Amino acid sequence: MAQINENYLKLPGSYLFSEIARRVNEFKVQNPDADIIRLGIGDVTRPLAPVVVEAMKQAVEEMGRAETFRGYGPEQGYDFLIEKIIANDYAPRGVQLGMDEVFVSDGAKSDTANFQEIFGVDNIMAVTDPVYPVYVDSNVMAGRTGNYDTEKGQYGRIIYLPCTEEGDMKPELPTAPVDMIYLCFPNNPTGMTLTKEELKVWVDYARENKAIILFDSAYEAFIREEGVPRSIYEVEGAREVAVEFRSFSKTAGFTGTRCAYTVVPKDIMIYDSTGEGHSLNKLWLRRQTTKFNGVSYPVQAGAAAVYTEEGKKQIQATIDYYMENARIIREGLQEAGFKVFGGVNAPYIWMKTPGTMGSWEFFDKLMTEAHVVGTPGAGFGANGEGFFRLTAFGTRENTEKAIERIKARMK
């Protein structure tokens, strides 16, 4: 008799965005003429940059000729892309990385979910609350989180770090020792950021406690303000304790193309039961070479084109487009009387629901009355209740239309 990994039974009934899709589809069946505007899941709407498309075309043509055909590529990524990543994303900020410290992958979602495999199941993990669900769910699957408390909306062995309105949506250090710390800045879902000084507090904590920070930096390209670090490695000592995840998905429109990278400095040590230290970099390389065959050559060629002079201009134009959407959403919600966070250094706007209205209740009201779909804060954790996320990744026309509807129908 085949038996399941019973940790899967501890997961919520459906993934957050699957539940949203179910409710939207049900509403559309009942209201086929409704013009639904989706500002929920963080998928992009702008096409790939022309320079990226051209690079991918050329790469595909190479794959069609025997003399330039490429089979299995290096699991860690092609050197031509890794060199550009280091030279453009890190060196200008004074961060020195080795070629073997960057791992190209098919997405930050899969990397943030898979990285926990290296850690023992007895490690204590900490997450901000609200939080991107993948961090929690992947650890539930591994058996690291304990059982789910339906009353609290939390797992028994996770240390939750509340991000509250009173605390400006920024987490405080854990009061109990932890081994794994998930941080995402600019933050999904709140859109908030940390200063270099605030981030240093976390790095210092990790160094003192031999903890490891799993730092999701997927939205760094959207940072607008001075003084906000683009990489955790801008903080002294971070190379000893932090893994950084980045993605081309939102930056360059690769949500359907799939390319990202993870930085694992060779300075980071992880310990066995005897206290002996082992290289986290080597363990991740071992994991990747066993379970991953690398990102396709045409996709990596497209990603490398992002770093050309023309590529940088085209990508920046797309980022500017989305951040103008963010401004429209943020200012429109404020005009309508809503309390909002984010939308300045990130493409997410985190709004407080009216009065004591629950976030799923607000979801249904917004969909039925304004025909606008967002993401209920409760889907990101217990401390997300009473809040709601809108994204700036829609088209300009739909973004403006959605805000006008909210201002007219949701006061």
Swiss-Prot record:
Subunit structure of this chain's protein: Homodimer.
Q: State the family named in the UniProt similarity comment for this chain.
A: Belongs to the class-I pyridoxal-phosphate-dependent aminotransferase family. LL-diaminopimelate aminotransferase subfamily.
Upper classification of the organism: Bacteria, Bacillati, Bacillota, Clostridia, Eubacteriales
Checking InterPro entries in the record gives: Aminotransferase_I/II_large (IPR004839), DapL/ALD1 (IPR019942), PyrdxlP-dep_Trfase (IPR015424), PyrdxlP-dep_Trfase_major (IPR015421), PyrdxlP-dep_Trfase_small (IPR015422)
Quick one: which pathway?
Amino-acid biosynthesis; L-lysine biosynthesis via DAP pathway; LL-2,6-diaminopimelate from (S)-tetrahydrodipicolinate (aminotransferase route): step 1/1
Keyword Transferase in record: yes
**What name is this protein filed under?**
LL-diaminopimelate aminotransferase
- Tell me the NCBIfam families matching this sequence: DAPAT_plant (TIGR03542)
This protein's gene is called dapL
Where does this protein have coiled-coil stretches?
none
